Design a protein with these regions (language model features):
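Proteins enriched for Cys/Gly/acidic motifs involved in redox and nucleic-acid/cofactor modification
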Residues: 1-225
Length: 225
């Protein structure tokens, strides 16, 4: 498996035609907007909800497709078709980068698998981050926008410091279904499977904690987890 994680910073030097013209984070004019595109499995759908929540907590506002200042593509490496769709989507978002100065990031399993190679393969991508680094997205954005660097964050969190995301009962109110995470990763390194390499080592959540989260969701009307 080799090295488990990577965190590097490289100088941002896109071609002149794609050089972004963007305001720094925290600018007092119009709020920054974002768009999250999801490819792959249900876990990615859940991760994209976390991505959106992380950006909104940092002051970003969801935008219509093609109108965002920040585009995050959440990827899947299990299914080849999902990876092909991601690469095709990146080509379409290049126009948005030229016309709006959009910041483009790639997260998820392809990001974890490719790491800095993705920056070389797609030179107009500004940042790459793995599944363990979703909570760090606002700080990644600051580095990209303020320091004008391209960023790769794919280091694994230690199992002792990993905190499982909890669904917020208030944002879940009125939903029929909701995701509850019980574990992540896998310790079985099978020759045909990339999960240990893209999702990390197995970390399980305490059973009482899972029951408590399900009970809190049931109180606000969720009926399926």
């Amino acid at each position: 498996a080799g090295e488990l994680g990577l965190a590097i910073m490289t100088q941002l030097a896109p071609a002149p035609s794609t050089q972004p013209n963007r305001a720094p984070v925290g600018a007092v004019d119009a709020p920054r907007t974002y768009e999250v595109r999801t490819y792959g499995c249900q876990m990615n759908v859940h991760d994209s909800e976390r991505l959106s929540g992380s950006l909104e907590a940092a002051g970003y506002i969801r935008a219509e497709r093609g109108q965002a200042d920040v585009v995050v593509i959440n990827t899947c490496a299990i299914r080849e078709k999902a990876e092909d769709k991601m690469l095709s989507a990146l080509g379409r978002y290049r126009t948005q980068k030229v016309s709006r100065g959009a910041v483009i990031g790639v997260g998820g399993c392809v990001a974890q698998q490719e790491k800095d190679k993705l920056l070389k393969k797609v030179p107009y991508v500004d940042f790459v981050f793995g599944p363990d680094n979703i909570s760090r997205l606002p700080s990644i954005m600051e580095r990209v926008e303020q320091d004008r660097v391209r960023v790769v964050e794919t280091a694994w969190m230690d199992s002792e410091e990993y905190v499982f995301p909890r669904a917020d009962p208030e944002t879940s109110r009125g939903k029929v279904t909701e995701f509850v995470t019980v574990m992540k990763g896998c310790d079985n390194v099978c020759s045909f499977c990339v999960v240990p390499h893209t999702r990390g080592r197995e970390v399980s959540r305490a059973f009482p904690e899972v029951l408590l989260e399900v009970a809190d969701l049931a109180k606000v009307g969720v009926r399926e987890v």
